[in-house]
């Protein structure tokens, strides 16, 4: 199971562990916490909830929010609610934990394969259309493209040095998954340790240049890694220094003549 669902289930388990299998009386539950007015503008009537009820309802919202955020799993929310209620009174679940894990693994595998196929199709369609746009250069047909946003006049990248740069990585939909913008200074990146499309797409890039790379999943992470499977990756790169290795080898003023 992925980390998200482990976290969700762990949270639910923690909440359920606090509850007793004995059914509490409604009067006892009603007495917990001080009554504070709670108004939900989306409800037809104003209602009052105790602090305990507020916490309980908010926990339900947080759980539902996690379910709603999921792009790869589709739960029947009504059945989730029934499962919560049944567990609180110690009723048996339709599956054992082992059966659940096995079934979940099967479902996740099918969802993963479906998502991989969809993303690959989107990537290939994007590259095909993008190749028609002005200024787009194909390094490898249907696999790797770049577009220069700002020309540079300094030294050009050759091979796989450690380059000093700023970058922003995003998906086709514009969602940013990684960036150096949060740093107050550029990062030193050994190109020999990057994905193939990144290093290859930077060849010939000059200091001061800004270019955008469009990388097919075959030259990126494919179906491996933490990103969605077969994602096309888009990197906007501003090259500060083509080879920081050479700069590091130059003696500093204080060391000259020693």
From Swiss-Prot:
Reactions catalysed: [protein]-peptidylproline (omega=180) = [protein]-peptidylproline (omega=0)
Gene Ontology CC annotation, any one: cell outer membrane
Keywords, in A-Z order: Cell outer membrane, Isomerase, Membrane, Rotamase, Signal
Bilayer topology: Peripheral membrane protein
Compartments (UniProt record): Cell outer membrane
Broad EC category: isomerase
Signal peptide: 1-15
PPIase FKBP-type domain: residues covered: 160-243
Superkingdom of the source species: Bacteria
Name of a matching Pfam family: FKBP_C
GO biological process: protein folding
E.C. number(s) listed in UniProt: 5.2.1.8
Keyword match Transmembrane: no
GO molecular function, one term: peptidyl-prolyl cis-trans isomerase activity
Coiled coil: none
PANTHER family membership: 39 KDA FK506-BINDING NUCLEAR PROTEIN, FKBP-TYPE PEPTIDYL-PROLYL CIS-TRANS ISOMERASE FKPA
Function summary: PPIases accelerate the folding of proteins.
Protein family according to the UniProt entry: Belongs to the FKBP-type PPIase family.
Record protein name field: Peptidyl-prolyl cis-trans isomerase Mip
Organism: Chlamydia pneumoniae (Chlamydophila pneumoniae)
Gene name in the database record: mip
């Amino acid at each position: 199971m992925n980390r998200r669902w482990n976290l969700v289930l762990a949270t639910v388990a923690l909440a359920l562990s606090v509850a007793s299998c004995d059914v509490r009386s409604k009067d006892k539950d009603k007495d917990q916490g001080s009554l504070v007015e709670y108004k939900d503008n989306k409800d037809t009537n104003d209602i009052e909830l105790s602090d305990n009820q507020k916490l309980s309802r908010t926990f339900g919202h947080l759980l539902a929010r996690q379910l709603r955020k999921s792009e790869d799993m589709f739960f029947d929310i009504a059945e989730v609610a029934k499962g919560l209620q049944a567990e609180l009174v110690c009723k048996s679940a339709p599956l054992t934990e082992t059966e659940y894990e096995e079934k979940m693994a099967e479902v996740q595998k099918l969802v993963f394969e479906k998502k991989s196929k969809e993303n690959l199709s989107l990537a290939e369609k994007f590259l095909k259309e993008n190749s028609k746009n002005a200024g787009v250069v194909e390094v490898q047909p249907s696999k790797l493209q770049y577009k220069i946003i700002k020309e540079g006049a300094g030294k050009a990248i050759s091979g796989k040095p450690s380059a000093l740069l700023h970058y922003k990585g995003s998906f086709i939909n514009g969602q940013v998954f990684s960036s150096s913008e949060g740093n107050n200074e550029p990062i030193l990146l050994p190109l020999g340790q990057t994905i193939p499309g990144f290093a290859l797409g930077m060849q010939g890039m000059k200091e001061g240049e800004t270019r955008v790379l469009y990388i097919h999943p075959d030259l990126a992470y494919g179906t491996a890694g933490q990103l969605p499977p077969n994602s096309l990756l888009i990197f906007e790169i501003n090259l500060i220094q083509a080879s920081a290795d050479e700069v590091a080898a130059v003696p500093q003023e204080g060391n000259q003549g020693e």
